[in-house]
C-alpha cells in the first residue's frame, strides 16, 4: 500500500495536543554519509509518561529535521512518536540500547531509515532499498553476494511469506497507525492470498526480500539462509533489519546484534558480540505484540502494498495477548533456544510443519557426515541360514546351528553328539540288533539248535537254547536230546479277562451233573416238588430240571426243580455238608479246567 506523507502525519490524529507535548525532542542533524550513533537516535522515542490525548494515545511532538534531512525526497518526512500507541495503557517496551526511557519505541537508526524508505519503495516499483540501509547501518557487516538467487528471485516476484518480511506475525506500522487512527483498536482484514504464497518453499526460506524495506542487508544476502560471516547472525537478516522484523520499537538498539526473531530457536550458540536473542518467536522486539493489540508494538513491516496477505495470518491469531511479551521484554534470554512466547501463556498457534528442530539441526549438521545405511550386516547373514550345511552329516535344516572346535557349522544333532561323546556323530545309523534266534554262527551247546526265542548261557558260559537252559536250571541235569523238537513249543496263553463260571448255587441256571451219592437219600425232602400240582408250575416257569445220574426207585424223586421266577431256593436234594462240598468242588474244578 503506497503511503503518502499525509499518512504518516500522526499529529493529525493527536490534534493540537501534540504541540503542547513537553517531552518532544528534535532529531539531531546528521551527515549524509554517516548515520548517527544509536544513542543519538534515542530522540525518536516518546517518554512513557507522555500526556494522554483524547484518543487515549500518548502525545508526542513532531520531529524537527535539519536542512540536509529535509532536502531529501518528500518521503523523508519521519514519523515522530510511537508510531502506534498502546490502546490499553502505556507501552510495554523494553529499555533497549539506544532508546531513551523505559518505554521508548524507536530503537535504532534502522527504524527511522525504514520509515523513510516506505514511500520511496512504494513509488519505485517496490525495489529493495535495504542495500542502502546496510551501508548506512553502523552495525551491518559486509554481506556476501546472493547465494540462492533462485529463491531470492522467487521471493522478490511473488508475495512473501508471513515471516519473510520484518513484520513477522504482526501488522505493518502503517496499518497499525491507520487502525489506531480509525478506531483506536486493530482491524484485521482476512484474505485468502496466503495460500498462494510459494507453496513449494518453507516459509523460512521464502522471500524475505519481497518487502521493499525488509532488512537492511536484503539485497546483499537472503535473510532466510545462514551467512558465511563469522560474526553475522546464523539465521539473521545479515545485520540489516533488527530482529523481530524491521527493528521493532523497543527492541535492541543494535541492528546487527539483534538476531532475527524468525528463528527463535537457533541451534548456534550466542554470538561473539554478546547480543542476546529476543525471547519472542514472532513478536520479539516489538513493544506491543504479534496480535496487533498494541499498535506501538507492531513491528514496522514496511510492506508497500502487501498488507492484506499478512493481515489474514494476524487475524488468525487470538487477540488475548498470547504473543505479547509485556513482562519479558525487559530481559534478554541468553539461551540460544528462546521460546516462541516469553509470557507464561501458551501460544494458540501451533508450530508449523517446518518449525521443527529437524530443519535447524540439519543446517547445523551440514558439516557432519550423515549416517550411511549399513550394507549386508551380520544379522542379514544370520538370516541366510539356508546356505549352511552340516560338515558332518550334510544336513541343511536344523533347529539350531552349532559349531565345532574349528568353527565349522554342525547341525544340532551332530553338535550335541560331538559335545557329549567327544566324537563325530556316525553318519550311518546302526542296524537293529539281529534277533537272538537268527544270530549267525550261534548254536546251542547241548542240542545244537540254531533257533530259539532266547539264548542263555550254561555254567561253563557256553550259549544254550532257551529250552536246554531252562531244563538245566530246573532239573540240574542237561536236557536229553530225545526231547529235542524241531519247532519251538509255545504256550497258548488264554485271555486274562475270562468270565468266571458261576458256581453251583441256588441262583445258578446251569444244569449240573450230580454224583451217584445224591440219588434218593433226601427223597422225602423233595416230596413237595413231586406233587402233580407243583411240577407243572415249576416246569412252566422255565426252571431247569436237574437230573440225577444214579438209579432212583422213585422216578419223581430223581428230579430237582428250581423256580426261577422268584429267584427263591425251593429245595435241594443234598442234605449233608459233605455232599454239598462234593457237589461244589467238582463244579469249581470244571470251571477252571474247561475254561
Curated annotation (Swiss-Prot):
Gene of this entry: GATA6
Involvement in disorder: Rare variants in GATA6 may be a cause of susceptibility to atrial fibrillation, a common sustained cardiac rhythm disturbance. Atrial fibrillation is characterized by disorganized atrial electrical activity and ineffective atrial contraction promoting blood stasis in the atria and reduces ventricular filling. It can result in palpitations, syncope, thromboembolic stroke, and congestive heart failure.
Protein name: Transcription factor GATA-6
Record InterPro entries: GATA_N (IPR008013), Transcription_factor_GATA (IPR039355), Znf_GATA (IPR000679), Znf_NHR/GATA (IPR013088)
GO molecular function: chromatin binding; DNA-binding transcription factor activity; DNA-binding transcription factor activity, RNA polymerase II-specific; DNA-binding transcription factor binding; NFAT protein binding; protein kinase binding; RNA polymerase II cis-regulatory region sequence-specific DNA binding; sequence-specific double-stranded DNA binding
GO biological process terms held by the UniProt record: animal organ formation; atrioventricular canal development; atrioventricular node development; cardiac muscle cell differentiation; cardiac muscle cell proliferation; cardiac muscle hypertrophy in response to stress; cardiac vascular smooth muscle cell differentiation; cell fate commitment
UniProt cross-link Glycyl lysine isopeptide (Lys-Gly) (interchain with G-Cter in SUMO2), position: 429, 473, 484
Taxonomic lineage: Eukaryota, Metazoa, Chordata, Craniata, Vertebrata
Subcellular location: Nucleus
Annotated PANTHER family: TRANSCRIPTION FACTOR GATA FAMILY MEMBER, TRANSCRIPTION FACTOR GATA-6
Amino acid at each position: 500500500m503506497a503511503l503518502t506523507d499525509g499518512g504518516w502525519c500522526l499529529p493529525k490524529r493527536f490534534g493540537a495536543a501534540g504541540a503542547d507535548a513537553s517531552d518532544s525532542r528534535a532529531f539531531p542533524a546528521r551527515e549524509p554519509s554517516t548515520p548517527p550513533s544509536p544513542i543519538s537516535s534515542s530522540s525518536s522515542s516518546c517518554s512513557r509518561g507522555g500526556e494522554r490525548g483524547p484518543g487515549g494515545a500518548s502525545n508526542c511532538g513532531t520531529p524537527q529535521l535539519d536542512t540536509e534531512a529535509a532536502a531529501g525526497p518528500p518521503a523523508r518526512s519521519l514519523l515522530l512518536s510511537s508510531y502506534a500507541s498502546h490502546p490499553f495503557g502505556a507501552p510495554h517496551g523494553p529499555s533497549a540500547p539506544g532508546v531513551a526511557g523505559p518505554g521508548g519505541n524507536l530503537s535504532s537508526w534502522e527504524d527511522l531509515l525504514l520509515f523513510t524508505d516506505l514511500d520511496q519503495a512504494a513509488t519505485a516499483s517496490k525495489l529493495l532499498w535495504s542495500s542502502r540501509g546496510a551501508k548506512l547501518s553502523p552495525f551491518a557487516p559486509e554481506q556476501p553476494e546472493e547465494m540462492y538467487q533462485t529463491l531470492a528471485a522467487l521471493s522478490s516476484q511473488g508475495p512473501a511469506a508471513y515471516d519473510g518480511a520484518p513484520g513477522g506475525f504482526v501488522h505493518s506500522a502503517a496499518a497499525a497507525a491507520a487502525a489506531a487512527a480509525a478506531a483506536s483498536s486493530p482491524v484485521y482484514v482476512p484474505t485468502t492470498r496466503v495460500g498462494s504464497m510459494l507453496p513449494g518453499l518453507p516459509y523460512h526460506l521464502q522471500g524475505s526480500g519481497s518487502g521493499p524495506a525488509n532488512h537492511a542487508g536484503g539485497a546483499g544476502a537472503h535473510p532466510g539462509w545462514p551467512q558465511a560471516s563469522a560474526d553475522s547472525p546464523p539465521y539473521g537478516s545479515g545485520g540489516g533489519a533488527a530482529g523481530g522484523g524491521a527493528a521493532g520499537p523497543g527492541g535492541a538498539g543494535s541492528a546487527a546484534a539483534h538476531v532475527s526473531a524468525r528463528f527463535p530457536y537457533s541451534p548456534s550458540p550466542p554470538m561473539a558480540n554478546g547480543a542476546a536473542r529476543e525471547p519472542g518467536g514472532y513478536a520479539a522486539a516489538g513493544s506491543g505484540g504479534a496480535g496487533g493489540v498494541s499498535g506501538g508494538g507492531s513491528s514496522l513491516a514496511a510492506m508497500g502494498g502487501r498488507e492484506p496477505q499478512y493481515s489474514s495470518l494476524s487475524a488468525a491469531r487470538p487477540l488475548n495477548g498470547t504473543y505479547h511479551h509485556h513482562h519479558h521484554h525487559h530481559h534478554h534470554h541468553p539461551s540460544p533456544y528462546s521460546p516462541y512466547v516469553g509470557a507464561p501463556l501458551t501460544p494458540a498457534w501451533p508450530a508449523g510443519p517446518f518449525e521443527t528442530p529437524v530443519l535447524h539441526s540439519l543446517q547445523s549438521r551440514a558439516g557432519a557426515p550423515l549416517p550411511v545405511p549399513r550394507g549386508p550386516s551380520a544379522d542379514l547373514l544370520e538370516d541366510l541360514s539356508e546356505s549352511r550345511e552340516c560338515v558332518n552329516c550334510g544336513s541343511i535344516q536344523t533347529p539350531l546351528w552349532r559349531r565345532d572346535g574349528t568353527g565349522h557349522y554342525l547341525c544340532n544333532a551332530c553338535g550335541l553328539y560331538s559335545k557329549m561323546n567327544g566324537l563325530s556323530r556316525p553318519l550311518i545309523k546302526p542296524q537293529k540288533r539281529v534277533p537272538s534266534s537268527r544270530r549267525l554262527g550261534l548254536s546251542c551247546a547241548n542240542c545244537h539248535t540254531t533257533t530259539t526265542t532266547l539264548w542263555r548261557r550254561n555254567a561253563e558260559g557256553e550259549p544254550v537254547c532257551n529250552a536246554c537252559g531252562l531244563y538245566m536250571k530246573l532239573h540240574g541235569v542237561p536236557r536229553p536230546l530225545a526231547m529235542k523238537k524241531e519247532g519251538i513249543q509255545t504256550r497258548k496263553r488264554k485271555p486274562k479277562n475270562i468270565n468266571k463260571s458261576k458256581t453251583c448255587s441256588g441262583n445258578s441256571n446251569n444244569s449240573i451233573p450230580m454224583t451217584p451219592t445224591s440219588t434218593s437219600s433226601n427223597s422225602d425232602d423233595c416230596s413237595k416238588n413231586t406233587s402233580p400240582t407243583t411240577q407243572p408250575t415249576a416246569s412252566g416257569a422255565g426252571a431247569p430240571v436237574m437230573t440225577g445220574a444214579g438209579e432212583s426207585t422213585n422216578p419223581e424223586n430223581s428230579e430237582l426243580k428250581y423256580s426261577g421266577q422268584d429267584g427263591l431256593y425251593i429245595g435241594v436234594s443234598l442234605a449233608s455238608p459233605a455232599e454239598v462240598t462234593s457237589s461244589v468242588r467238582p463244579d469249581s474244578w470244571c470251571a477252571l479246567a474247561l475254561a
